Amino acid sequence: MLDLALLGCGGGMPIPDRFLSSLLINYRGRKILIDCGEGTQVSMKILGWGFKSIDIICITHIHGDHTVGLPGLLATIGNSGRKEPLTIIGPEGIKQVISGFRTIVPYLPYDINIIENPKESLKIRLIKNSVEVLKGHNNSFMENKSSKDFARKKEVNTDGCGDHNDILSCDIEISTLELDHSCPCIGYKFYVNRKPKFNLEKAEKNNVPKFLWSKLQKGENITYEGIKYNPNMVMGRGRRGIKLSYITDTRPINSIIKFIESSDLFICEGTYGQDEDLHKAIKNKHMTFREAAKLAARGNVSQLILTHFSPSMMEPENFKQNAVEVFQNTLIGKDRFVKTLCFRE
């Protein structure tokens, strides 16, 4: 299962009881943060979700309401005792922003790996006290302090990590989509793999030696006494994972529909609640509640949570009906709202 917390649901500027954009994902004790607006650390502290285990920070774009919390957070992560490298993913310009922030926090006890404007999906493998990130045109795992001996070449699949070999060695896949905002901006999709079950009958039918079963279940390819063995020889059929999509600060472009298709949860900006504010949404390259709901309906998602509310909209719940009329299973996001996504049977 996947736990998530909306740390901040505001856009533009914080207001009482509403911090700026931030979402935290927790999977098997490792964390991914999406955006880091003002107040991110406060919400984390209130919830009691630790800082040290944040392995990846995904930034949608470099506007201040999505990034100004970064310097303080990076310092806090360092003060929490983290030594393992941390990965920051973002659009064009993120390297320059992080470089500027490092003048504020020049001394960190961990390395920062920056992936700017990724063109391929990124595969994440959970390891002890950290993660490994698969990136680059040769699809090799990034070399860092905790993964120098791990390098694999794999094909990238849009949803999930491909065949049994990939699924067994890849826990999460992160995909990005270029959006339509006033600066380079990307949306994120997270696919959590559900590993297939061991198939005893299949293993015996393929005459796989018992002492190789555990290695094959971990995704290894093995040659023993001149015979090649692979995970497909002992594993059952693939199982559906969990898909979470996150789209904010954009107009509702058509490419979003395919990107979010069949998501278990679609978190989307709803900067403006009233239909009458459509002209503002167009001018500022944002969305209304109704526009976000139309994307959810066309993308056939299971649930929509609206976030990134204009500071002028004090009570987003008052405009919920504008979204529900289009997509019934809509929730209005609130700071520190916590939800668990479970694997389907």
Describe the role of every protein-language-model region.
Residues 1-49, 83-85, 188-190, 236-247, ...:
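Conserved beta-strand hairpin/beta-sheet module of binuclear metal-dependent hydrolase folds
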Residues 34-37, 54-62, 66, 90-91, ...:
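Active-site neighborhood of phospho(di)ester-bond hydrolases with catalytic His/Asp-centered motifs
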Residues 39-89, 111-118:
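Active-site metal-binding motif and surrounding structural segment of the metallo-beta-lactamase
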Residues 70-76, 98-101, 314-322:
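Metal-dependent catalytic neighborhoods of phosphoester/phosphodiester hydrolases
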Residues 82-84, 92-123, 130, 135-152:
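Active-site neighborhood of divalent metal-dependent phosphoester bond hydrolases
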Residues 86, 314-337:
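Short acidic, glycine/proline-enriched helix-loop-strand junctions
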Residues 86-89, 115, 265, 300-312:
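Divalent metal-dependent hydrolysis catalytic cores, especially in the metallo-beta-lactamase
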Residues 121-306, 317-326, 342-345:
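Metal-dependent phosphodiesterase/nuclease catalytic metal-binding core
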